[in-house]
Amino acid sequence: MTEASAPLIDVDPRLLEVLVCPVTRGPLEYDRAKGELISRAAKLAYPIRDGVPIMLPEEARELEG
């Protein structure tokens, strides 16, 4: 599935309270439009597939900038 066709998924805010970036152990932000969890500190975007966050650095997309 491409980013353009990623389904809009609602993420439980409680999930964001307990999930952290596996690289930095820092907080994550949810990008609903792209269906990703964002680690600003690591500059990585972790995909959400079929409602499941894929928290593997090798599966993450590098953020530009």
UniProtKB/Swiss-Prot annotation:
Superkingdom of the source species: Bacteria
Gene3D superfamilies assigned to the protein according to its UniProt record, in alphabetical order: 2.20.25.10
PANTHER family: PROTEIN PREY, MITOCHONDRIAL, ZGC:162634
Name the record gives this protein: UPF0434 protein CCNA_00107
InterPro entries: Trm112-like (IPR005651)
Entry GO CC: cytosol
Stretches that traverse the bilayer: none
Family: Belongs to the UPF0434 family.
Phylogenetic placement of the source organism: Bacteria, Pseudomonadati, Pseudomonadota, Alphaproteobacteria, Caulobacterales
